[in-house]
Amino acid sequence: MAMGKALSVKWTREHLLIALNLYCKLPFGRFNHRNPVLIEVASKMGRTANSLVMKLCNFASLDPIHRARGVVGLKGASKQDRLVWDEFQTDTATLGLASEQLLHDIFTADDDRELDFLQRDRVRLEPVTRFAMPVGPTEVQATVRARRGQQFFRQAVLTAYDVRCCITGIAIPRLLVASHIKPWGEFPTDRLNPRNGLCLSSLHDAAFDAGLITVDDRMRVVISRELKGYLPQESLARNFLAYEGRRIRKPEKLADPDWSCLEYHRTKIFTG
């Protein structure tokens, strides 16, 4: 299909979903027409990096966290932008997966490779063995879809927390996990919802999943009696007790963790 001039390319629903996916994965400070990631994706879409940046800024103007900070974007968010944004808020599972598939397909048809944006200097195609995936009852016959959805969730959650553990501040992507607050296997509709996620180090993710730590209604770290029962241990004191009562780092986009998800974790998973 002939694209003509890049600026004349219409914003289709498919292109909007790709832009929304990028919005979830790139920090606000990287919305720049010189960003090599945006240049590469825009080229695949047949449009200019400037037009893609403008769309990302329009999505930023709809983001409640950025609105609270006074970010107003370009004040040019269209009705179509708002509809896609609102649909994403109410049906993240469907749109998250659809956007990830669209973005994947403009780069490769190889289902054994996934896109990685966390290095931020360029788009990387990584072998699937790099990506761990939670196991649930519906995944047996849908490994590609599940992996792709998990890839979206991981990159969206890590980017929302500036690729730092929200408890310790560790900023090494290989050591970070997009931890589900409500379990992956039990709540299919929240599997891809970034508000059902926390960016944690692998150690703190394991403790969170086991109910040894949680987050209270003031966003402070709570340590269980069970974990404290293993004291005294210098490593426990350094890695857990040092953060007890401290507020977790809050996300920089897409809204704070869902209160109902955190309440579920406190009442159903946390060992007390």
Residue map of PLM features:
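Major-groove recognition helix of helix-turn-helix-like DNA-binding domains
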Residues: 47-62
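Short Lys/Arg-enriched helix C-cap and helix-to-coil transition segments
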Residues: 64-84
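Short, charged surface segments at domain edges that flank catalytic/cofactor-binding sites
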Residues: 125-164, 182-195
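Short alpha-helical "recognition helix" segments of helix-turn-helix
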Residues: 37-42
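Short, Lys/Arg-enriched anionic-surface-contact patches
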Residues: 2-22, 144
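The −1 position to Zn-ligating cysteines in a subset of zinc-ribbon hairpins
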Residues: 48, 164, 177, 200
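Short helix->loop/beta-hairpin flanking segments within DNA-binding domains
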Residues: 23-33
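A detector for short metal-coordination/catalytic motifs
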Residues: 152, 170-173, 182-272
